[in-house]
Design a protein with these regions (language model features):
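Metal-dependent phosphoester-hydrolase catalytic domains
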Residues: 84-85, 139, 150-249
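Active-site environment of divalent metal-dependent phosphoester hydrolases
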Residues: 10-13, 40-44, 66-68, 118-120, ...
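N-terminal, active-site-proximal structural segment of metallo-dependent hydrolase catalytic domains
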Residues: 1-53, 65-71, 239-249
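Active-site-proximal beta-strand elements of phosphoester/diester hydrolases
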Residues: 1-11, 100, 106-117, 145
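His/acidic metal-ligating clusters that form di-metal
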Residues: 127-145
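Catalytic metal-binding/acid-base residues of hydrolase active sites
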Residues: 7-9, 38-39, 78, 114-116, ...
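Active-site neighborhood of phospho(di)ester-bond hydrolases with catalytic His/Asp-centered motifs
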Residues: 33-36, 60-62, 143-147, 172-177, ...
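Structured beta-strand-rich core segments of catalytic domains in phosphoester-bond hydrolases
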Residues: 32, 37-115
Length: 249
């Protein structure tokens, strides 16, 4: 199964999508697409129709709380709203930027997430709640995926310790191929979009895709890009029975 998580950088606005967005999604051909730093609204009816046209017919969106960004999940397979909630946090940013779904046909669960740009005590409280939410799912076939605003491969980066701790506990937190997932206006690249998979699933490959067919998916040049974040593409292993597999089945 191919999973794609993409931060669209809407910054709490119902921004228009780049004309290159839909062709990119068509070429990426995900089985499940998660959009974060995204805002849903009346203008998105065409987006939902377009996603259906490329096979992503099943769509769920997190509730927008206090004007925060949201998460949209679109899938080739039926989705069922899950019960895991985002961490309680300042102005409900953690709750709004979080969506848990189930994919019954593949005995699989997915959480789209974006860590809000908190600081100080607000950031500490958010991460405490997020880690609690992740750890309570340790026995499930589940992936958390999106913009975590940290990099586990840079130990000195704020909150890297949390993703590193999950690795130590047996969660799969791969280091994706590619140089960066976010690029600043001054062209400084960082790797802050990640996947966290339970030990009951196996990730075959993870990568950041910054360009596709000559189109810039992510760039510091606003006029030419889809976003300032590259899509994170994750390939989950499947068993011979067509179900998502782990190392033990």
């Amino acid at each position: 199964m191919k999973l794609v998580a993409w931060n669209l950088g809407h910054q709490c606005r119902e921004d228009a999508l780049s004309h290159a967005f839909l062709p990119a999604v068509r070429t990426l051909a995900p089985d499940l697409l998660s959009l974060n730093e995204y805002v849903h609204g009346q203008s998105r009816a065409q987006l939902v129709a377009d996603l259906s046209d490329v096979g992503l017919k099943h769509v769920l969106v997190s509730e927008r709380l206090n004007g925060n960004n949201q998460v949209l999940i679109a899938s080739r397979y039926q989705l069922v709203q899950g019960e895991v909630l985002g961490p309680q946090s300042k102005n409900q940013g953690g709750e709004s930027n979080f969506l848990h779904v189930r994919v019954p046909s593949h005995n699989f669960e997915f959480v789209g997430v974006r860590a809000p740009a908190y600081a100080g005590e607000d950031l500490r409280v958010y991460w405490s709640g997020l880690m609690q939410a992740i750890r309570q799912c340790a026995g499930r076939r589940i992936v958390f995926m999106g913009d975590f605003n940290t990099d586990p491969d840079r130990p000195r980066r704020a909150n890297a310790k949390h993703l590193r701790a999950l690795r130590d506990e047996g969660w799969s937190v791969p280091s994706p191929e590619g140089e960066w997932s976010y690029i600043s206006p001054k062209s400084a690249g960082t790797r802050i979009d990640h996947a966290v998979a339970s030990m009951h699933l196996r990730i075959e490959r993870a990568e950041y895709i910054t360009s596709l067919g000559g189109v810039e998916l992510a760039s510091s040049r606003k006029a030419n890009r889809v976003s300032d974040h590259a899509p994170l593409v994750v390939h989950l292993a499947e068993s011979s029975r067509g179900k998502l597999g782990s190392d033990s089945n």
